[in-house]
From Swiss-Prot:
The gene is rplR. GO terms for molecular function: 5S rRNA binding; structural constituent of ribosome. HAMAP family: Ribosomal_uL18_B. Disulfide bonds: none annotated. SUPFAM superfamilies: Translational machinery components (SSF53137). NCBIfam families: L18_bact (TIGR00060). Keywords: Ribonucleoprotein, Ribosomal protein, RNA-binding, rRNA-binding. This is Large ribosomal subunit protein uL18. GO terms for cellular component: cytosolic large ribosomal subunit. The keyword Ribonucleoprotein applies. Part of the 50S ribosomal subunit; part of the 5S rRNA/L5/L18/L25 subcomplex. Contacts the 5S and 23S rRNAs. It comes from Rickettsia canadensis (strain McKiel). The keyword Methyltransferase does not apply.
């Protein structure tokens, strides 16, 4: 029986392989920890980060103990969409990073879809 960590790593590598085949677009990558959620727009051909947003940003950060919830994921999604729009990015590939498309990940993606197409 596979452990949860091994399943996660296998899922992440499978997603990254599929994304690497569509290399003509930049990718919106997310990472979530127990306390925070991070989003980055990365250009893999140049190996640079174009824009980033997280719950550590001053506009999003509050006095709550946990910032990795749906309410803050929506704020991070809107922030990354605004930064991408100002950088002139209209289309991205969504890299959920091995996380299941549910809850916080879905909320961030739906909020980012307001200004970015993926």
């Amino acid at each position: 029986m596979r452990s949860a960590k091994l399943k996660f790593e296998k899922r992440r590598s499978r997603i990254r392989h599929k994304i690497s085949q569509t290399s003509n677009r930049v990718r919106l990558s997310i990472f979530k920890s127990c306390r925070h959620i991070y989003a980055q727009i990365i250009d893999d051909s140049k190996s640079i980060t174009i824009a980033s947003a997280s719950t550590l940003d001053a506009k999003i950060k509050k006095l709550k103990k946990s910032h990795c919830n749906i309410e803050n994921a929506i704020k991070v999604g809107k922030a990354i969409a605004t930064k991408a729009d100002s950088a002139g990015i209209k289309e991205v590939v969504f890299d959920r990073g091995g996380y299941k498309y549910h809850g916080v990940v879905k909320a961030l993606a739906d909020a980012a879809r307001e200004k970015i197409k993926f």
